[in-house]
C-alpha cells in the first residue's frame, strides 16, 4: 500500500489525500484496509507535522529514509523556525529499525541527532 501527499493506495483502490500523513485514527483505518486486502507492506510519507502532532506515535517503521531538508515548512501554521522543523523531521529516526540517510545533505547531523536506528 501507499500513504502519501497525493493519495493513498490500497490494492486497486485510490483515495485522494487531505494531508500528507493522515490523523492517527485514519492511518489505522488505512492499515486495516490494507491488511484486509492482503497487503503486507506499506510505503508511507511521514510529514514533520505528523511527527510533531504525534500522528504516528507508537509505530515502529522497518525503514526510514531521509532525502533532504529545505526551509519550506516554516510559518505560523507549521514550524516556528528551521531548528524546530529539523527536530521534528529527526523524530522519525527514533521510530525506525533501519535508517537510510542522504550523506550529502548539509543538515544530516541535525537529522541524525538522537536517532536510534
Role assignments for model-derived ranges:
Residues 1-10:
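Short beta-strand-centered segment that lines the nucleotide-binding/catalytic pocket of NTP-utilizing
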Residues 14-24, 72-80:
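Flexible beta-alpha connector loops of hexameric P-loop NTPases
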Residues 30, 34-35, 45:
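Switch I (G2) and immediately adjacent beta-strands of P-loop GTPase domains
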Residues 36-37, 63-117:
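Acidic, Mg2+-coordinating active-site environments of NTP-dependent enzymes
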Residues 39-49:
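Switch II (G3) loop of P-loop NTPases
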Residues 50-57:
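Conserved helix/coil segment N-terminal to the catalytic DExD/H
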Amino acid at each position: 500500500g501507499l500513504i502519501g501527499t497525493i493519495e493513498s493506495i490500497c490494492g486497486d483502490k485510490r483515495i485522494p489525500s487531505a494531508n500528507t500523513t493522515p490523523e492517527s485514527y485514519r492511518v489505522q483505518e488505512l492499515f486495516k484496509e490494507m491488511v484486509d486486502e492482503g497487503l503486507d507492506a506499506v510505503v508511507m510519507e511521514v510529514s514533520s507535522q505528523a511527527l510533531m502532532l504525534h500522528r504516528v506515535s507508537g509505530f515502529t517503521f522497518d525503514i526510514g529514509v531521509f532525502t533532504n531538508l529545505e526551509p519550506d515548512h516554516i510559518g505560523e501554521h507549521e514550524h516556528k523556525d528551521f531548528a524546530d522543523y529539523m527536530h521534528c523531521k529527526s523524530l522519525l529516526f527514533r521510530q525506525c529499525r533501519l535508517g537510510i540517510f542522504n550523506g550529502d545533505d548539509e543538515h544530516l547531523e541535525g537529522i541524525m541527532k538522537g536517532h536510534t536506528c
